[in-house]
A protein has these predicted regions:
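A membrane-topology feature that recognizes alpha-helical transmembrane segments
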Residues: 1-52, 57, 108-296
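IQ-motif-like calmodulin-binding regions
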Residues: 37-112
Length: 296
Protein backbone atom coordinates (compact mmCIF):
# COMPACT_ATOMS: atom_id res chain seq x y z
CA UNK A 1 0.00 0.00 0.00
CA UNK A 2 1.44 3.36 -1.05
CA UNK A 3 1.97 6.35 1.17
CA UNK A 4 -0.85 8.20 -0.63
CA UNK A 5 -3.29 5.36 0.06
CA UNK A 6 -2.29 5.30 3.72
CA UNK A 7 -2.85 9.05 3.95
CA UNK A 8 -6.32 8.64 2.42
CA UNK A 9 -7.16 5.89 4.91
CA UNK A 10 -5.91 7.98 7.83
CA UNK A 11 -7.90 11.02 6.66
CA UNK A 12 -11.09 8.98 6.24
CA UNK A 13 -10.60 7.40 9.66
CA UNK A 14 -10.05 10.82 11.26
CA UNK A 15 -13.20 12.25 9.67
CA UNK A 16 -15.17 9.19 10.75
CA UNK A 17 -13.84 9.37 14.31
CA UNK A 18 -14.81 13.05 14.53
CA UNK A 19 -18.30 12.29 13.22
CA UNK A 20 -18.69 9.42 15.68
CA UNK A 21 -17.46 11.30 18.73
CA UNK A 22 -19.24 14.61 18.17
CA UNK A 23 -21.80 14.63 15.33
CA UNK A 24 -23.65 11.38 16.01
CA UNK A 25 -24.36 12.05 19.73
CA UNK A 26 -25.75 15.47 18.82
CA UNK A 27 -27.82 14.05 15.96
CA UNK A 28 -29.15 11.21 18.12
CA UNK A 29 -30.14 13.58 20.93
CA UNK A 30 -31.97 15.87 18.50
CA UNK A 31 -33.75 12.98 16.76
CA UNK A 32 -34.81 11.40 20.05
CA UNK A 33 -36.35 14.68 21.22
CA UNK A 34 -38.16 15.15 17.91
CA UNK A 35 -39.35 11.55 17.87
CA UNK A 36 -40.73 11.80 21.40
CA UNK A 37 -42.64 15.00 20.66
CA UNK A 38 -43.99 13.56 17.40
CA UNK A 39 -45.01 10.30 19.10
CA UNK A 40 -46.63 12.08 22.04
CA UNK A 41 -48.65 14.41 19.81
CA UNK A 42 -49.73 11.61 17.46
CA UNK A 43 -50.70 9.29 20.32
CA UNK A 44 -53.01 11.71 22.09
CA UNK A 45 -54.51 12.97 18.84
CA UNK A 46 -55.39 9.37 17.97
CA UNK A 47 -56.87 8.92 21.45
CA UNK A 48 -59.17 11.90 20.79
CA UNK A 49 -60.08 10.48 17.37
CA UNK A 50 -60.82 7.12 19.01
CA UNK A 51 -63.20 8.77 21.49
CA UNK A 52 -64.98 10.55 18.63
CA UNK A 53 -65.21 7.27 16.69
CA UNK A 54 -66.80 5.50 19.66
CA UNK A 55 -69.33 8.33 20.00
CA UNK A 56 -70.39 7.76 16.39
CA UNK A 57 -70.02 3.95 16.38
CA UNK A 58 -70.39 2.79 20.01
CA UNK A 59 -70.79 -0.89 19.13
CA UNK A 60 -67.57 -1.44 17.17
CA UNK A 61 -63.85 -0.71 17.22
CA UNK A 62 -61.92 0.88 14.34
CA UNK A 63 -59.95 -1.48 12.10
CA UNK A 64 -56.67 -0.98 10.29
CA UNK A 65 -58.20 -1.68 6.87
CA UNK A 66 -60.77 1.12 7.13
CA UNK A 67 -60.28 4.28 5.12
CA UNK A 68 -59.33 7.70 6.42
CA UNK A 69 -59.13 8.58 10.08
CA UNK A 70 -60.76 5.32 11.17
CA UNK A 71 -57.97 3.29 9.57
CA UNK A 72 -55.31 5.47 11.21
CA UNK A 73 -56.98 4.99 14.59
CA UNK A 74 -57.15 1.26 13.91
CA UNK A 75 -53.38 1.22 13.36
CA UNK A 76 -52.92 3.21 16.58
CA UNK A 77 -55.13 0.79 18.51
CA UNK A 78 -53.22 -2.24 17.23
CA UNK A 79 -49.94 -0.57 18.20
CA UNK A 80 -51.29 0.23 21.68
CA UNK A 81 -52.24 -3.39 22.23
CA UNK A 82 -48.86 -4.58 21.01
CA UNK A 83 -47.07 -2.13 23.31
CA UNK A 84 -49.29 -3.18 26.21
CA UNK A 85 -48.39 -6.85 25.72
CA UNK A 86 -44.72 -5.86 25.82
CA UNK A 87 -45.26 -3.69 28.92
CA UNK A 88 -43.93 -0.71 26.96
CA UNK A 89 -46.68 1.85 27.61
CA UNK A 90 -46.23 4.68 30.07
CA UNK A 91 -48.40 4.69 33.19
CA UNK A 92 -50.30 7.76 31.98
CA UNK A 93 -51.06 6.29 28.56
CA UNK A 94 -52.15 2.94 30.01
CA UNK A 95 -54.54 4.75 32.35
CA UNK A 96 -55.88 6.90 29.49
CA UNK A 97 -56.61 3.74 27.50
CA UNK A 98 -58.45 2.18 30.44
CA UNK A 99 -60.54 5.34 30.84
CA UNK A 100 -61.38 5.11 27.12
CA UNK A 101 -62.68 1.58 27.65
CA UNK A 102 -59.68 -0.31 26.24
CA UNK A 103 -58.51 -3.19 28.42
CA UNK A 104 -54.69 -3.29 28.38
CA UNK A 105 -54.13 -5.52 31.41
CA UNK A 106 -52.15 -4.88 34.58
CA UNK A 107 -48.60 -5.16 33.23
CA UNK A 108 -49.04 -2.78 30.32
CA UNK A 109 -46.74 -0.03 31.64
CA UNK A 110 -43.31 0.09 33.24
CA UNK A 111 -42.44 3.79 33.46
CA UNK A 112 -43.94 7.26 33.74
CA UNK A 113 -44.20 9.79 30.93
CA UNK A 114 -41.44 11.86 32.57
CA UNK A 115 -39.13 8.83 32.59
CA UNK A 116 -39.94 8.13 28.94
CA UNK A 117 -39.13 11.72 27.99
CA UNK A 118 -35.85 11.48 29.90
CA UNK A 119 -34.96 8.34 27.95
CA UNK A 120 -35.55 10.26 24.73
CA UNK A 121 -32.32 12.24 25.12
CA UNK A 122 -28.66 11.33 24.83
CA UNK A 123 -25.71 12.78 26.73
CA UNK A 124 -22.86 10.33 26.03
CA UNK A 125 -20.29 9.16 28.54
CA UNK A 126 -16.64 9.37 27.37
CA UNK A 127 -16.53 5.62 26.68
CA UNK A 128 -19.63 5.91 24.49
CA UNK A 129 -17.98 8.67 22.46
CA UNK A 130 -14.90 6.44 22.12
CA UNK A 131 -16.96 3.48 20.88
CA UNK A 132 -18.81 5.63 18.35
CA UNK A 133 -15.55 7.22 17.20
CA UNK A 134 -13.90 3.82 16.69
CA UNK A 135 -16.91 2.38 14.84
CA UNK A 136 -17.23 5.32 12.48
CA UNK A 137 -13.47 5.49 11.89
CA UNK A 138 -13.60 1.87 10.73
CA UNK A 139 -16.65 2.51 8.55
CA UNK A 140 -15.23 5.59 6.85
CA UNK A 141 -11.83 3.93 6.32
CA UNK A 142 -13.49 0.78 4.93
CA UNK A 143 -14.73 2.64 1.85
CA UNK A 144 -11.31 3.36 0.24
CA UNK A 145 -9.96 0.10 1.68
CA UNK A 146 -12.56 -1.89 -0.28
CA UNK A 147 -11.95 0.19 -3.40
CA UNK A 148 -15.27 2.05 -3.32
CA UNK A 149 -15.15 5.17 -5.59
CA UNK A 150 -15.16 8.38 -3.58
CA UNK A 151 -18.65 9.55 -4.63
CA UNK A 152 -20.17 6.17 -3.76
CA UNK A 153 -18.14 6.01 -0.56
CA UNK A 154 -19.46 9.42 0.49
CA UNK A 155 -23.03 8.13 0.16
CA UNK A 156 -22.17 5.05 2.20
CA UNK A 157 -20.66 7.29 4.86
CA UNK A 158 -23.98 9.15 5.04
CA UNK A 159 -25.72 5.77 5.39
CA UNK A 160 -23.29 4.88 8.18
CA UNK A 161 -23.96 8.10 10.09
CA UNK A 162 -27.73 7.56 9.75
CA UNK A 163 -27.45 3.93 10.85
CA UNK A 164 -25.19 4.76 13.82
CA UNK A 165 -27.63 7.46 14.94
CA UNK A 166 -30.43 4.91 14.70
CA UNK A 167 -28.41 2.43 16.77
CA UNK A 168 -27.92 5.02 19.53
CA UNK A 169 -31.63 5.88 19.53
CA UNK A 170 -32.68 2.23 19.59
CA UNK A 171 -30.34 1.36 22.44
CA UNK A 172 -31.40 4.43 24.38
CA UNK A 173 -35.18 4.49 23.86
CA UNK A 174 -36.05 1.45 21.70
CA UNK A 175 -36.96 3.53 18.67
CA UNK A 176 -35.43 4.13 15.24
CA UNK A 177 -36.38 7.68 14.18
CA UNK A 178 -38.06 8.31 10.85
CA UNK A 179 -35.25 10.67 9.81
CA UNK A 180 -32.64 7.90 10.07
CA UNK A 181 -34.70 5.64 7.83
CA UNK A 182 -35.31 8.44 5.33
CA UNK A 183 -31.58 9.22 5.13
CA UNK A 184 -30.82 5.52 4.59
CA UNK A 185 -33.44 5.33 1.86
CA UNK A 186 -32.26 8.41 -0.04
CA UNK A 187 -28.50 7.91 0.32
CA UNK A 188 -28.80 4.15 -0.20
CA UNK A 189 -30.91 4.64 -3.31
CA UNK A 190 -28.39 7.12 -4.71
CA UNK A 191 -25.61 4.60 -4.00
CA UNK A 192 -27.50 1.88 -5.88
CA UNK A 193 -28.05 4.25 -8.80
CA UNK A 194 -24.37 5.18 -9.05
CA UNK A 195 -23.11 1.63 -8.57
CA UNK A 196 -25.62 -0.40 -10.59
CA UNK A 197 -27.59 2.16 -12.59
CA UNK A 198 -31.34 1.93 -13.12
CA UNK A 199 -31.13 -1.86 -12.67
CA UNK A 200 -29.88 -1.26 -9.13
CA UNK A 201 -32.87 0.96 -8.36
CA UNK A 202 -35.24 -1.67 -9.75
CA UNK A 203 -33.57 -4.45 -7.75
CA UNK A 204 -33.65 -2.30 -4.63
CA UNK A 205 -37.35 -1.59 -5.10
CA UNK A 206 -38.11 -5.29 -5.54
CA UNK A 207 -36.07 -6.14 -2.43
CA UNK A 208 -37.85 -3.43 -0.41
CA UNK A 209 -41.26 -4.67 -1.56
CA UNK A 210 -40.34 -8.25 -0.63
CA UNK A 211 -39.18 -7.17 2.84
CA UNK A 212 -42.38 -5.18 3.37
CA UNK A 213 -44.44 -8.23 2.38
CA UNK A 214 -42.53 -10.42 4.84
CA UNK A 215 -43.00 -7.89 7.67
CA UNK A 216 -46.71 -7.52 6.88
CA UNK A 217 -47.17 -11.29 6.91
CA UNK A 218 -45.19 -11.67 10.14
CA UNK A 219 -47.28 -9.00 11.85
CA UNK A 220 -50.52 -10.61 10.69
CA UNK A 221 -49.40 -13.87 12.26
CA UNK A 222 -47.87 -12.51 15.47
CA UNK A 223 -50.01 -9.46 16.25
CA UNK A 224 -51.98 -11.24 19.00
CA UNK A 225 -48.84 -12.29 20.85
CA UNK A 226 -47.27 -8.82 21.04
CA UNK A 227 -44.20 -10.01 19.15
CA UNK A 228 -44.90 -8.09 15.95
CA UNK A 229 -42.25 -6.13 14.07
CA UNK A 230 -42.21 -2.49 15.19
CA UNK A 231 -42.92 0.35 12.77
CA UNK A 232 -39.40 1.73 13.19
CA UNK A 233 -37.86 -1.64 12.39
CA UNK A 234 -40.10 -2.01 9.33
CA UNK A 235 -39.08 1.39 8.00
CA UNK A 236 -35.41 0.64 8.63
CA UNK A 237 -35.35 -2.81 7.00
CA UNK A 238 -37.23 -1.44 4.00
CA UNK A 239 -34.65 1.32 3.57
CA UNK A 240 -31.82 -1.19 4.00
CA UNK A 241 -33.33 -3.51 1.40
CA UNK A 242 -33.55 -0.61 -1.06
CA UNK A 243 -29.94 0.38 -0.33
CA UNK A 244 -28.57 -3.17 -0.62
CA UNK A 245 -30.58 -4.35 -3.61
CA UNK A 246 -29.46 -7.81 -4.76
CA UNK A 247 -27.35 -8.30 -1.63
CA UNK A 248 -30.39 -7.93 0.63
CA UNK A 249 -30.78 -11.66 1.29
CA UNK A 250 -27.21 -12.10 2.50
CA UNK A 251 -27.27 -8.86 4.48
CA UNK A 252 -30.52 -9.87 6.17
CA UNK A 253 -29.15 -13.34 6.90
CA UNK A 254 -26.05 -11.86 8.56
CA UNK A 255 -28.27 -9.54 10.60
CA UNK A 256 -30.67 -12.14 11.91
CA UNK A 257 -28.08 -14.86 12.46
CA UNK A 258 -26.17 -12.37 14.63
CA UNK A 259 -29.35 -11.38 16.48
CA UNK A 260 -30.25 -15.03 17.11
CA UNK A 261 -26.74 -15.80 18.34
CA UNK A 262 -26.86 -12.82 20.72
CA UNK A 263 -30.29 -13.83 22.05
CA UNK A 264 -29.20 -17.44 22.51
CA UNK A 265 -26.09 -16.35 24.39
CA UNK A 266 -28.25 -14.09 26.57
CA UNK A 267 -30.63 -16.93 27.40
CA UNK A 268 -27.78 -19.33 28.17
CA UNK A 269 -26.32 -16.71 30.51
CA UNK A 270 -29.79 -16.18 32.05
CA UNK A 271 -29.72 -12.50 31.04
CA UNK A 272 -32.62 -12.80 28.59
CA UNK A 273 -35.93 -14.66 28.68
CA UNK A 274 -37.65 -16.39 25.78
CA UNK A 275 -40.08 -13.50 25.34
CA UNK A 276 -37.63 -10.65 25.96
CA UNK A 277 -37.10 -8.31 23.04
CA UNK A 278 -33.76 -6.83 22.00
CA UNK A 279 -32.91 -3.60 20.14
CA UNK A 280 -32.53 -4.59 16.48
CA UNK A 281 -30.63 -1.54 15.18
CA UNK A 282 -27.15 -2.86 16.15
CA UNK A 283 -27.82 -5.98 14.10
CA UNK A 284 -29.37 -4.00 11.26
CA UNK A 285 -26.03 -2.18 11.00
CA UNK A 286 -24.50 -5.58 10.15
CA UNK A 287 -27.05 -5.84 7.34
CA UNK A 288 -25.85 -2.48 6.00
CA UNK A 289 -22.18 -3.46 6.20
CA UNK A 290 -22.58 -6.86 4.56
CA UNK A 291 -25.07 -5.66 1.97
CA UNK A 292 -23.07 -2.67 0.74
CA UNK A 293 -19.34 -2.57 1.45
CA UNK A 294 -18.77 -6.33 1.45
CA UNK A 295 -21.27 -7.61 -1.10
CA UNK A 296 -22.90 -4.58 -2.72
Amino acid sequence: MTGYALNVLALCAAVGATAGAFAIPRIADMLLSRAYLRSYTWWYRCLDDFAHYRDVCPDRLPRQNEKGTAGAVGIWLADCRSQALKGALTHERAEALREAGIDVGKGASTRSEVEQQRRCSFSPWPWQRAVLAAAMALWFAAQPLFGVPWHQGALLCVCGVAMASGVVCDLRARMIPLECCAALLVAGGAYQLLRHGSAGIAEGAVAAAAVLAVCWTANRIARKSGESVGFGDIRCVTALAFACGPATLLGAAACYVSACAFSLAGMLAHRLGRRDGIPMAPFLSIWLAVGTTVLG
